[in-house]
Amino acid sequence: MKKIILLLLILAGFITKNYSQFKITGTISDSKTHQTLPNASIFIPELNIGVISDLNGNYTLENIPNGKYDVKFSYIGYFDLIKNLSEKNNILQLNISLNPKSPICLNQVVITAGTYSTQDETAIKIETINKKDIEGFGGISLIKDLSRIPGIDAVSKGNGIATPIIRGLSTSNILVLNNGVKMQNFQFSVNHPYLIDEFGVERIEVVKGPASLLFGSNAVGGALNMIKESPAPKSTIKTDVNMNYNSNTQGLVTNVGVKSTPGNYFFGLRAGIKSHKDYIDGNGKIVPNSRFNAKSFKIFTGFNAKNLVSKLFVDYNLMKLGLSVPPAFKLFSGNDRTNNYWYQDLSNILISTKNVLYLGKIRNELNINYQTNNRKLFETPDISEEFKTVDMLLNTWTYELKTSKPFGDHKMIFAFQGLNQNNKNSNAPEHVLPDFSIYDLAGMGLVQLNFMKKLHTQIGIRYDFRHINIKKQEHVHQDINKNFQNLSFSMGLTGILSHKVLIRSNIASGFRTPSIAELSQEGGHGARYELGNPNLAPQRNIEGDLSLHIHNTKTVLEFSGFYNYINKYIYLSPTDETSIHGLPVFKYLQDNAKLYGFETNFGFFPASWMNFSFAYNYLVAKKNNDSYLPLIPQNKLRGNISFSKSFDKKQLKDFSFEIESIYAFVKNNHHIAESNTPAYNIYNLSAVQTLAFNRQKIKISAKINNLFNTTYIDHISTLKGLGYYEIGRNINIGIKIILDKH
């Protein structure tokens, strides 16, 4: 591997001297008034390069390798415009007219489909959650906030612990990615949160349905991809300071980011802290030990040469996370920030490199990632190292070599991927998972065909091989050596029937190998005793999706239906047995399963400053015998009314106000070990005002979640049955200061 990397770098040095480039130049203006727009952004996501227009709206973007790219033009208060660029000349004159915003926006550049594409070019339905929406949630947990999106929910244990659910599937059945890198956090359990926060995230891309073609094992239900923020435009320094206070938990959040692009080199760094006391539910009761404290530090850097783009990212996250479990309730002595007992001490370091080399029209990408995740559990009030109960260290190397080549309006993509992973327990008394190692190898081919810009098809196939090695050790009575193989496919079609109507269909397969816990676990975990099964077979599924998008100047309608059939679905089932310590025994079993349903969205925009939207999702999840699967969320109806106004004042700028309603229907069709869950209805409010002072902007926000302090419990909350409910009224006050220096 080292020799290959060295050879590529030497080759890159030679090639960057011999391949030509071009530049684009032009003027950005308003499409109606024809006034020029200063400080507009011009950005090429694939190359990670960008500039801003000058006081007269003029711009020049240089050092662009010959090839095909999507260029994004954006300006506050206007629609983003995406231009497909394919040029071999030295200079391209490109004048752009931007349209003032209305609430309807169809197209964005996405990367989770395997390559940079606009949304209407992808045969896979990819939803995007932009930075404005992420900042506007106003919740305490990013993952829980995502449950406001139809088809996405979260299994939670308080505020700090939340695991996403996509169309009824969670934990080992979905993937969470940090800028395209699989997060590794012992995700077999809902008690193990992903160490990632909302700061430094440009947008979140959501794939609903099998994504094994792109990511391999575990992407049975879909994937969430947290896309990192873009570098600063050339010759600028951007700084943002974020401060938030949450009334319910007396939560304090501070995050500061700085980034700059002095030339062909760019860099950025970001640091933040979060501290929350135990939360108070709608009944006014303190939920013991739901507190958490977190720290984060992020760095990115890179450079653009003639035909080479190289980027390095380092993320370091720390979290001390209280566990709201019955043994902790007995030790509760008062609300506090400090983690004293029954808490997880978590750390995660992710180092990733992304390197792109252009050889004519051929794009070659080499990505290498290293991730280390340490999970410690302390149960007693003594926080010294001698009293830790669990101490596991998971080290993961992943690598990817990808090549894409356009031919006409079409594109071919080939990729080779691999993973080396090992887990090591220290001398802590409990080994939740044994020591193990995993090795993956995979090859993938994908063809994207575009006909007359009206019909887009995507066909792909992938082969995966996985080897799992678990040596005989405590709670593992024999060596477990397993080899798994799988062939995945995906076929999709997007038809643009008119500029107002888009239809998309897709059929895809997915798979996942049994997790280490499912193969080997034997011991207490939480409030139960879990028994693994070394003879479990891989899960395989196939899903069909059909979606429709219709819009005009005042309305938008979207519908997405799906049917997901899973062969040998793995689940944890209760038994009639009891362990020697009195814990109920649960065993991992397999059965065929089916999940089907739909999501629909309707928006009405009577004026440019007013927006009404409604969304409903429906889901059924059963085994073949028609009994229900566990941890399936309630069907929900969401309503939203928003008002926005842009002021052409010297200091007073954008203002927005939003009212949101979430209604969860009663849940009486559930797994045999679960109980009925009543319906609930909660309301949220938010208001944001932007002020401007020269090159400084200040955003002041006030958000109220659970406005009427409703007492409720969600069906998939792990606190259900313990006498505690979801968080009560929470008022979030935030200030964001943005400083630009040219």
Which residue ranges define each predicted feature?
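Bacterial Sec-dependent N-terminal signal peptides
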Residues: 1-25, 42, 69, 106, ...
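Structural motif
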Residues: 26-37
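Short, acidic, small-residue-rich periplasmic hinge/interaction motif at the N-terminus
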Residues: 29, 40-45, 74-78, 88-135, ...
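A structural signal for beta-strand boundary/capping segments at domain termini and interdomain linkers
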Residues: 36, 80-82
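Short, acidic Ser/Thr/Gly-rich low-complexity loop/linker segments typical of extracellular
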Residues: 47-58
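Short, flexible loop/turn segments at beta-strand junctions in immunoglobulin-like
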Residues: 61-63
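Outer-membrane beta-barrel proteins, especially TonB-dependent receptors
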Residues: 102, 112-137, 144, 155-169, ...
